């Protein structure tokens, strides 16, 4: 019992299947048994009520024929017998006719005529008590009251014979008396007793006053009682159901036209149940046999359904836990066999998808590591560029300071030339000083040329580094394109996996969640790659800007070198001219003018060089700022690459729980 209760509580598809099959088996047989039972009941009920009505009509017809025959005789005698016959000499003839009639009709106990003068003529003559007055009898009074109509007395027991008789009387045509006969009802009573309705049903007759005339168990003359009397005496004929002594019965009845008596037939309703029970018992036996045979078939069918279902459930549980190597073995070509094959195909598809995802994840992880390494190298290169730019900026500042020094020297030279013009007496001394100053200026110019060449070399190196950075940025862009492709492929594979899982229904729901997570990781990888690509594009644009600025600085430096060369040539000329002053005093004024003009040109050139140096310093500062921004971008790229690597590791951890090889 405990195992059965445990089986009932355990959720299983077999229980609703058993209930459904039993319902399909039991309901039709049960309904058929019920309707067969009801049909047999109704048919038997109709047969019994029809039998009751037929017997009642037959009994009434027998009574009616007998009464009509006797009424005809009474009518005949009431027409032929008159006062003259009763009082005349033909009394003997009348008695002879009475004798003849009673002889021919055994059911007539006596026939007699009574006159107004209280004389009675009867056959057979059994003697009349002295002082007997026939005119005081009910049969006489009723006949006189009805005037020409035959009347029937209440049935009574004949004292002489003990038979139940009824007196039929009618007033003579001339009104001089009444003719009457005693009708023995034994034949009617016997016919009533012979009637059987069903097994225990019977017929009975009552008078208009509810007194029994004929009944198998109740004494004649007993007044009937019960609810049935109200229905019987409220209509001329019909049928109804009633309760008698606590038992259900049915009755059919009719009313005799001549007497108003009630002829009825009744039977117990329980007879219907007794007669219908074999049909019900047969139906129950058929139902039990059907349940046994159907139960065996149902168990076989349910086992054929649940056995492959259990295999499917067990395999689905293993697949949901990550074991994709499990294979369902259902040896059947029906829908379950097809479902098993489809399940195996789904498992194979999942193994293929997981394998591709694992390979893609490994590629993403490898690419992420390469991207991280490239980002680290780029960061180092950017740091070197930043240091080189800072060194270049320091050299440029030193060059600016030296240019200011040169400008100061040129100012002093201009003052010296002015003094030469003012004081010819000190020309020699001034010439010597000018020669020294020219020599010093030449050295400064040569030094400036050296610094400008150094700046030019630094700019070229910076330009080469920036170009290399641009090339590496392009390489990073290519790597990002590869990552984007891998992310798109991973996303596509995740979508395919989700589709396959959706086809699998409930069994693929767990894998659908995994596929959705894989797809989200792929989308995040693609988004991160796009962000990195955007940062790389910004770096490329900034590198291009830096490259353009380096090219501009390189061009300006080259122009500065040309101007410096010109300045060196001018100082050389000054130096040569100052050495010739002592010998060429006559050309002093012209030389002074030339020196003044040359010094002005040199001063202008130095100012130009100073302006160029300042512009170069500003450009270098911009390049330094761009390099710092690039360094920050590379750090972001490195961080994104690390995030992508972490996501790849998470995806690897997720896919590792799936077993795709035996």
Curated annotation (Swiss-Prot):
Main function: Chemotactic-signal transducers respond to changes in the concentration of attractants and repellents in the environment, transduce a signal from the outside to the inside of the cell, and facilitate sensory adaptation through the variation of the level of methylation. All amino acids serve as attractants in B.subtilis, they appear to cause an increase in the turnover methyl groups, leading to methylation of an unidentified acceptor, while repellents have been shown to cause a decrease in methyl group turnover. The methyl groups are added by a methyltransferase and removed by a methylesterase.
The organism of origin for this protein: Bacillus subtilis (strain 168)
Q: Which residues lie on this side of the membrane: Cytoplasmic?
A: 1-16, 303-662
GO annotation, biological process: chemotaxis; signal transduction
Can you say what this protein is called? Methyl-accepting chemotaxis protein TlpB
| Sequence positions bearing Glutamate methyl ester (Gln) | 594
Pull the Extracellular topological domain ranges from the record.
Answer: 38-281
Question: Where does the UniProt entry say this protein principally localizes?
Answer: membrane
């Amino acid at each position: 019992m405990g195992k059965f209760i445990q089986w009932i509580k355990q959720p299983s598809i077999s229980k609703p299947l058993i209930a459904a099959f039993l319902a399909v088996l039991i309901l039709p047989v049960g309904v058929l048994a019920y309707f067969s039972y009801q049909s047999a009941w109704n048919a038997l009920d109709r047969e019994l009520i029809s039998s009751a009505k037929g017997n009642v009509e037959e009994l009434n017809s027998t009574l009616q024929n007998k009464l009509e025959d006797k009424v005809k005789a009474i009518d005949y005698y009431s027409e032929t017998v008159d006062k003259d016959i009763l009082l005349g000499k033909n009394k003997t003839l009348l008695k002879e006719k009475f004798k003849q009639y009673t002889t021919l009709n055994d059911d007539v106990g006596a026939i007699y005529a009574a006159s107004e003068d209280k004389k009675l003529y009867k056959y057979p003559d059994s003697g009349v008590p002295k002082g007997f007055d026939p005119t005081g009898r009910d049969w006489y009074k009723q006949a006189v009251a009805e005037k020409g109509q035959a009347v029937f007395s209440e049935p009574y027991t004949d004292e002489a014979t003990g038979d139940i008789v009824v007196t039929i009387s009618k007033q003579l045509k001339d009104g001089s008396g009444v003719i009457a006969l005693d009708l023995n009802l034994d034949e009617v009573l016997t016919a009533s007793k012979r009637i059987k309705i069903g097994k225990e049903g019977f017929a009975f007759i009552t008078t208009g006053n509810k007194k029994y005339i004929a009944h198998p168990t109740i004494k004649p003359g007993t007044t009937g009682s019960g609810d049935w009397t109200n229905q019987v005496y409220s209509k001329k004929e019909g049928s109804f159901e009633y309760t008698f002594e606590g038992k259900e019965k049915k009755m059919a009845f009719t009313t005799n036209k001549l007497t108003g008596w009630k002829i009825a037939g009744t039977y117990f309703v329980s007879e219907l149940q007794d007669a219908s029970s074999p049909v019900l018992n047969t139906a129950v036996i058929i139902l039990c046999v059907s349940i046994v045979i159907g139960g065996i078939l149902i168990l076989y069918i349910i086992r054929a359904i649940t056995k492959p279902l259990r295999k499917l459930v067990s395999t689905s549980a293993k697949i949901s836990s990550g074991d994709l190597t499990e294979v369902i073995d259902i040896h059947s070509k029906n829908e379950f066999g097809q479902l098993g094959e489809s399940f195996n195909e789904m498992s194979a598809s999942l193994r293929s998808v997981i394998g591709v995802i694992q390979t893609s994840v490994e590629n993403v992880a490898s690419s992420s590591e390469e991207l991280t390494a490239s980002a680290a190298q780029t960061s180092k290169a950017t740091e070197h560029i930043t240091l080189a730019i800072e060194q270049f900026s320091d050299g440029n500042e030193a060059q600016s300071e030296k240019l200011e020094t040169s400008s100061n020297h040129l100012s002093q030279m201009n003052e010296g030339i002015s003094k030469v013009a003012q004081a010819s007496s000190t020309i020699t001394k001034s010439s010597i000083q000018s020669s020294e100053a020219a020599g010093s200026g030449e050295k400064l110019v040569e030094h400036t040329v050296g610094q400008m060449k150094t700046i030019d070399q630094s700019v070229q190196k910076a330009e080469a580094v920036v170009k290399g950075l641009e090339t590496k940025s392009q390489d990073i862009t290519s790597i990002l394109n590869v990552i984007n492709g891998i992310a798109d492929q991973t996303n596509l594979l995740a979508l395919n996996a989700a589709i396959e899982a959706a086809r699998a229904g409930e069994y693929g729901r767990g894998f659908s969640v995994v596929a959705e997570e894989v797809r989200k990781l792929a989308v995040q990888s693609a988004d991160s790659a796009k962000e990195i690509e955007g940062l790389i594009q910004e770096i490329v644009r900034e590198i291009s800007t830096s490259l353009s600025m380096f090219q501009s600085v390189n061009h300006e430096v080259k122009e500065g070198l040309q101007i410096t060369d010109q300045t060196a040539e001018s100082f050389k000329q000054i130096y040569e001219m100052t050495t010739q002053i002592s010998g060429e005093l006559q050309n002093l004024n012209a030389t002074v003018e030339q020196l003044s003009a040359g010094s002005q040109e040199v001063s202008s050139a130095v100012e130009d060089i100073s302006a160029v140096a300042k512009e170069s310093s500003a450009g270098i500062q911009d390049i330094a700022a761009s390099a710092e921004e690039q360094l920050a971008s590379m750090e972001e790229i490195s961080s994104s690459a690390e995030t992508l690597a972490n996501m790849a590791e998470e995806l690897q951890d997720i896919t590792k729980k799936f077993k795709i090889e035996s």
